[in-house]
Amino acid sequence: MEIHIPSLVLCISFFIFFKIVSKLKTKTSNRKHLPLPPGPWKLPLIGNLHNLVGALPHHTLRRLSRKFGPMMSLQLGELSAVIISSADAAKEIMKTHDLNFASRPQVAAADIIGYGSTNITFSPYGGHWRQLRKICTLELLSAKRVQSFRPLRERVFVDLCRRFADHGSSAVNFSEEFMSATYTLISRAVLGEEAEQHEGLLPNVKEMPELTAGFDISEVFPSVGLFKVMSRLRKRIVAVHKDTDRILDDVIHQHRAAKSEEHKDLLDVLLQLQEDGLELPLTDENIKSVLVDMLVAGSETSSTVIEWAMAEMLKNPRILEKAQEEVRRVFDKEGTVDESHIHELKYLKSVVKETLRVHPPAPLILPRICGETCEINGYEIPAETKIIVNAWAVNRDPKYWEDSDCFKPERFLDNLVDFRGNHFQYIPFGAGRRMCPGIGFGLANVELPLAMFMYHFDWELDGGMKPQDLDMEEKFGASAKKLKDLFLIPAIKRTLPTK
C-alpha cells in the first residue's frame, strides 16, 4: 500500500491540532462550571447602578446581600465588582488570597489627589508601596513616634476643653469643634507647630473625602472620554488638589530653609529620609502624597469615631453615666486625665470598640482589585474584578454578634476579639497587607479626648431634646459621619488643668 508522506504529515498535524483544541475546550468547559457569585438582575449598559440609587450604599448592599449571599456580583457600568458581606468571605480576600487582592483599582480622584496614586492608600502593590508601608510603620506611625506626640495631644485637647468651658450653659457644635481640634493636632504632628502656615489646608482636608467618594459617571464608563471632559466633580478635584499642592510646596520649602537636626514633625522625618537616600527615590511628589494621606485619614477617622461615640452615649444615658463613673474613679485622685493610665479604662475602651463596630470609619473598605482569576468559595473571581468589602455589614453579622444592630459596649468587656486584623467578624480598619497602618496613632487621638470629656464635663443635648429623639442618620461619604452635626451643652464638673 502506497503511503503519501504529505498526506500523513497533514493527518498527524490535524490530529495534534484536534487534541490541543480538545484540551483547550475541556479547560474552558471546566472553567465554565465555576459560576460567578450571584447578584441582582442587570439593566443594559448601566448594569446594577440603579440598585445603588437612593439609600446609603452600605445599607443597600447589606440588604441585597441578604438575598443574594455574602459574595455578590454587581455590574457598575463597565466595571465588574464583587461585594463581600461576611467574615468568612472577607477572610478569603484579606488573608487566604491577600496577595492576589493586594492592589487597588485605578480611581481618577485618587490619581489626582494622591499624586498619581503614589500614596500609601492607593499605590499599586509593589516595591514603592512596600517602601512607603515600611516608612509608615517604622518611622512615622511607630509606637515610639505616637508616644512622642503625647504633649501635643494633651495641649490641643485641653485647649478644646477650655473652649467648651467658655460656652457656659450654651450649646456647642461638638462635631465642628472636634474636627477643627483634630486637624490642629494632625497638622502640627505632620507639618509642624506653625499652624498659621497651613490653616488654609483645613477646608481642603474636609472636602477631599467627599470628593473621592462622590459619584462620577466617568469612573464607571472609563472608555467614554467625553464623560471626563464634562465632569464637574473632576474639575473640583483638580482645583482642590492644585490649592493643596501650592500650600504643601510652601511648607516643604520652609522646612528645608529652617533645617534642624532635631526631627520635630513627620515632614522633617520624610525630608531626612529623602536626603539619606532609599532603595527607591523618595520624590517631593511622593512626600506630598504621604502628607495628604496623613492629614485626611488622621483628621477624618478620629473625628468620625468621637462624634459617633458621643452621640451613642447621649442616646443611651446609662452608658454615658457608666463611662463617666469609671473615668472619674480612675482620675479623681490626680485631678486630671493622664494618658499613661488610659489602659485602666476598660469600659471606655469598650465604648470605643463598640463605636468602631457599629460605625466603622470607612463602612465600605477601599476597593481592592483581583490580580489573577481565582476561585473563592466555589465561585470564579475574574482578573480585574473590583472587590468591595462592606465592613459595616460584616461588623453587624448576627452570626457573630447578638443584637448586632444595638450599641452594647458590654459585649467587649470579656471579649478577646480585636481590630488588629485577626478576627474577620470585626474589621473597622481592614485586614491583611492593606490594613490601616495608623491604628495606634488614631486610637490615641480618640481615647485621650474622650476620657477628658467624660472626666471634666456633664453633657446634655441641645434644646431639651430627649435621648430617643437624637437623629442618628449617616451622611454619604468615604466615612459615614453623622448627617446632622451634634450640638451639645457641656457643664463643667471637674476643674481643667492650669496653663
UniProtKB/Swiss-Prot annotation:
**Transmembrane stretches, by residue range?**
4-24
Q: In which pathway does it act?
A: Secondary metabolite biosynthesis; terpenoid biosynthesis
A GO biological process held by the record: diterpenoid biosynthetic process
Signal sequence span per UniProt?
none
Concerning InterPro entries, the annotation shows: Cyt_P450, Cyt_P450_CS, Cyt_P450_E_grp-I, Cyt_P450_sf
* Superkingdom assignment: Eukaryota
Q: Where does it live in the cell? A: Membrane
Its top-level enzyme class, in one word, is: oxidoreductase
User: Reaction(s) catalyzed by this protein?
Assistant: ferruginol + reduced [NADPH--hemoprotein reductase] + O2 = salviol + oxidized [NADPH--hemoprotein reductase] + H2O + H(+)
One GO CC annotation: membrane
What task does this protein carry out? Monooxygenase involved in the biosynthesis of labdane-related diterpenes natural products. Catalyzes the oxidation of ferruginol to produce salviol. Salviol is an intermediate in the biosynthesis of carnosate, a potent antioxidant.
**Which protein, by its recorded name, is this?**
Salviol synthase
Q: Which organism is it from?
A: Salvia pomifera (Apple sage)
